[in-house]
Amino acid sequence: IKTQVFKNNLSLSGSIEANEQVEIRSEVSGIVEAISFQEGSFVNKGQVLFKVNDQELKAQLIQATTKEGLAAENARRAKLLLQKEAISQEEYDVARAEHKSTQAQVQLIRAQIAKTSVRAPFSGKIGLRSISPGTYITPTTLVANLVNIGKLTITFSVPEKYASQIKLNTNITFSVSGTTQKYHGVVYAIEPEVATATRTLQVRAIADNKEGKLFPGTFANVELPLDVINDAIIVPTEAIVPIQNGKKVFISEKGMAKEVKVEASTRTD
């Protein structure tokens, strides 16, 4: 019998997910005027993805701007009349409030026009589109999915008996079906409580995917290291004999069997 380094790894099933994912939709309703992305391509944060026709909004802006100009002039005149005590404070306040209201309307329409250019909220890979130029869309219309696959998360559940051994920044290895390649990740988030329904603790790790070999939605076979024993004595399970107060094994000493009481730490498959 001799001591050796023993790594106690826990084998778990996990799910690979995009670090960032969003459904691209328009905040305004209207006819799609132009589409500026290629399906399945990489897009940059802030890049215009598609444009909704804004002619009606621009016409409304011209009308609102004209009203705002008239209201500004009325407010200016009302101020002069107030200084000459030709009108009451209340009449001036009404003119001033009307001016502020028209200013707000102009700002609102400009904000609506800005929303007709739908931009990527972050850099990533955009999926298949469900619209074409000329399609009438509303805020409920799903245009495409945008995912950041440069980094992926691996979510897995750990049985509650191991919960106290899970630490942040723990390095994990994992593999996916169809390949023997090993990938690496780091635990960055741990659920603060054990799920009562499953008696498991949910853990999440993050991994680089710069080469794009991994896909969100796939399963992962996770190897989670629990601890490392530098001077472990490894004994076959069948060599351990249960006794009333614990366990024992038999060793050979000077050609004779000797009974030794042992304390089992970790069992492997």
Please tell me what each predicted stretch does.
Residues I1-S29, Y188:
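N-terminal beta-strand block that forms a small beta-sandwich/beta-barrel module immediately after a flexible targeting
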Residues T140, I234-E238, K261-V262:
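Short beta-alpha junctions and helix-cap segments that line functional grooves
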